Swiss-Prot record:
Record field: transmembrane: 8-28, 51-71, 83-103, 132-152, 185-205, 240-260, 267-287
The name this protein goes by in its record: Taste receptor type 2 member 8
Keywords: G-protein coupled receptor, Glycoprotein, Membrane, Receptor, Sensory transduction, Taste, Transducer, Transmembrane, Transmembrane helix
Annotated membrane topology: Multi-pass membrane protein
Compartments reported by the entry: Membrane
Gene: TAS2R8
Pfam families, per database record: TAS2R
GO molecular function: bitter taste receptor activity; G protein-coupled receptor activity
Glycosylation sites: 167
Database matches in PANTHER family: TASTE RECEPTOR TYPE 2 (PTHR11394), TASTE RECEPTOR TYPE 2 MEMBER 8 (PTHR11394:SF31)
InterPro entries for this protein: GPCR_Rhodpsn_7TM, TAS2R
Length: 309
């Protein structure tokens, strides 16, 4: 039997899982339908589609990890399961981070204005090389996840020895301690793509400032399309920074939770907050993307009419 706190955790994480799958699945579905109709897909939609697929994987791994560690800690003490979950989490986490970074860099290159030769060269080449860049991100994520699987597997013998010397609760702490150092290290390495996204954000803000100074010379009475594009992209990046900050902090909380007296509560809280990043940011993408927002309005209108009939 689960405690009231466990039931609340189950309700919250299930609700977040459903919303995350619906939000990311909706983006993938709209882009896929548009791809079928037009027989081609834009670079933005291509990156978005790959991004939401990686987020669906990340959401699934977070939910599985949360349910197992919070509700069935005795099952989690099995080293092979820990290795499998940690490996898949690392792969999905890195893939999502790099794909998000690609989207942020793409926004910057397409929207920002600059006369720098390197910027102009990247602006011309980005559409042609984006598929190779995403493939490279996939390869990096796969390599990192394989490395962590190898590193964690080395502790299997020590884990097997500890199994005969400690009870379930103590062994849970031991097993978490085994994976603390490599997981923390690879958590820190995820800062690299985030720094690239942060640089793109500040450069885009700088581009908007320069553009605003230029249009002030002309009393147009409103914002031009370039300004609107800058603002939408900056809002998207700002929401990403906010959600990623929450995700990163709570991921570290989950990693360090074995040091806390109430590790189960810390673990549950960390998992619930962490899933907000891959779920919540996707809804921001829908709101700030004209095509996705208009498609959602049409869909909701059809649902409303169907319910009335």
């Amino acid at each position: 039997m689960f405690s009231p706190a466990d039931n609340i955790f189950i309700i919250l994480i299930t609700g977040e899982f459903i919303l995350g799958i619906l939000g990311n699945g909706y983006i993938a579905l709209v882009n896929w339908i548009d791809w079928i109709k037009k027989k081609k897909i834009s670079t933005t939609d291509y990156i978005l589609t790959n991004l939401v697929i990686s987020r669906i994987c990340l959401i699934s791994v977070i939910v599985v990890n949360g349910i197992v560690t919070v509700l069935y800690p005795d099952v989690y003490t099995k080293s092979k399961l820990q290795i499998a979950i940690s490996t898949f989490w690392t792969f999905a986490n890195y893939l999502n981070m790099w794909f998000t970074t690609c989207l942020n860099v793409f926004y910057f290159l397409k929207i920002a204005n600059s006369s720098h030769p390197l910027f102009l060269w990247l602006k011309q080449k980005i559409d042609m090389v984006v598929r190779w860049i995403l493939l490279g991100c996939f390869a990096i994520s796969l390599l990192v996840s394989l490395i962590i699987a190898i590193v964690l597997s080395r502790d299997y013998r020590f884990h097997a020895i500890a199994k005969h010397k400690r009870n379930i609760t103590e062994m849970f702490h031991v097993s978490k301690m085994l994976y603390f150092e490599p997981l923390t290290l690879f958590n820190l390495l995820a800062i690299v793509p985030f720094i690239v996204s942060l640089m793109s954000f500040f450069l885009l803000v700088r581009s908007l400032q320069r553009h605003t100074k230029q249009i002030k010379l002309y009393a147009t009475g409103g914002r031009d399309p370039s300004t609107e594009a800058h603002v939408r992209a900056i809002k998207t990046m700002t929401s990403f920074i906010f959600f990623f900050f929450l995700y990163y902090i709570t991921s570290l909380l989950v990693t360090f939770s074995y040091l806390m007296t109430k590790y189960k509560l810390a673990m549950a809280f960390g998992e619930i907050v962490a899933i907000l990043y891959p779920s919540g940011h996707s809804f921001i993408l829908i709101i700030l993307n004209n095509k996705l927002r208009q498609a959602s309005v049409r869909m909701l209108t059809c649902i409303k009419i169907t319910c009335v009939i």
